[in-house]
Amino acid sequence: MSTTTQNIPWYRHLNRAQWRAFSAAWLGYLLDGFDFVLIALVLTEVQGEFGLTTVQAASLISAAFISRWFGGLMLGAMGDRYGRRLAMVTSIVLFSAGTLACGFAPGYITMFIARLVIGMGMAGEYGSSATYVIESWPKHLRNKASGFLISGFSVGAVVAAQVYSLVVPVWGWRALFFIGILPIIFALWLRKNIPEAEDWKEKHAGKAPVRTMVDILYRGEHRIANIVMTLAAATALWFCFAGNLQNAAIVAVLGLLCAAIFISFMVQSAGKRWPTGVMLMVVVLFAFLYSWPIQALLPTYLKTDLAYNPHTVANVLFFSGFGAAVGCCVGGFLGDWLGTRKAYVCSLLASQLLIIPVFAIGGANVWVLGLLLFFQQMLGQGIAGILPKLIGGYFDTDQRAAGLGFTYNVGALGGALAPIIGALIAQRLDLGTALASLSFSLTFVVILLIGLDMPSRVQRWLRPEALRTHDAIDGKPFSGAVPFGSAKNDLVKTKS
């Protein structure tokens, strides 16, 4: 950018169409967050009515993560083939329908299936909205685009907590899910009133449809084997998370089977760049493992361990959700200033100073707890707002929605494991200690994976001929693309 351009405030680099595109996607993601967290808010009520164990109740949160990988793949491919806008609308309709079904669920199995539908829609909304906004904004503002967008999910969680405190004590937990049908109206408006993403239009102008991940996996020469593997993965995940298996060894075997299937899909669809794709799934897996025990079980901790009433729970969750939302926006500024990976690492390191105090002070002072949660979530959870930008930079435009959707949502199975692991550890320790221990230890794994740019590093080790040296979204160098000790200018020389 020129000196004159740099002196212009960042928001003046955006035209009205770009702001409208962002606003529409942000509202869609807010509604996604609202619908998704409803189950966490009423988990104790649902557990009591259906007579569920703690692990079974936690599996209702996990259910939405089980189907996310498939939703991210299918709806991401839709976004790559037919445009980001159609994929966004379809995703909103899916998660809204699943939420309504939760309100009518007569028992555990029905609600579990409804949560599977929500997971598919949520996955599609994440991938399509993220690529839509990132590709609509200028390159030097794309960390902000990512961070601002993902803040909508946290705002949706805050709104849901406030609605919970007003609705559930009067009309019961089912009424909360009936409200979740409203996003369908918004989806109909989206279909007619927002433009297509600029990068996607430029890539596809006058060209034949791209060959998507769905084409490669389910219409190629290995389609029969891939369909069988898809069914096998779905069945294995069902048995792992539906509370039907008590044998840890069997669960481990099924988990390894799923991992092998997902790696196979990545090898087939990404070609020589499969090491990058696999490592991105690992990054996201640990990102969910460190953050989602708190996201999923914080309401339960507040209601059981701290004995807070619904109104106080809503107030504390407001601080938590608002902190995450602010953190997404702050992360966007940090990412454009420091660079995506450096901003991620610095924010997570700062969050580590707060995670132990959050669960050590108890519930005597609600305001102190709320403030600690605000800053911890701002630094620890909010920085995940730039994760779509980080992941998307490893994929070209014609594979970005499916690549982001699949890698992110396979890794998001960590979110399915997280509440169950937290609940299991809480059987031996108190819930607060379990949540703090998981988050504190696993955050360091994410710091290492992102700080060392392990996707690029492993790609260089295994398939260097397909190494990408620069971010496909903003053109900045990948630090892991050169060996330790190499000159920094090497990356500039190799930029295509």
From Swiss-Prot:
Domain of life: Bacteria
Induction: Negatively regulated by the transcriptional repressor NanR. Induced by N-acetylneuraminate, via inactivation of NanR.
Reactions mediated catalytically: N-acetylneuraminate(in) + H(+)(in) = N-acetylneuraminate(out) + H(+)(out)
Record carries keyword Transmembrane helix: yes
Recorded topology in the membrane: Multi-pass membrane protein
Transmembrane segments: 22-42, 58-78, 92-112, 148-168, 170-190, 224-244, 247-267, 278-298, 313-333, 355-375, 406-426, 431-451
Family: Belongs to the major facilitator superfamily. Sialate:H(+) symporter (SHS) (TC 2.A.1.12) family.
Designated name of the protein: Sialic acid transporter NanT
Organism, as annotated: Escherichia coli (strain K12)
Lineage per the UniProt record: Bacteria, Pseudomonadati, Pseudomonadota, Gammaproteobacteria, Enterobacterales
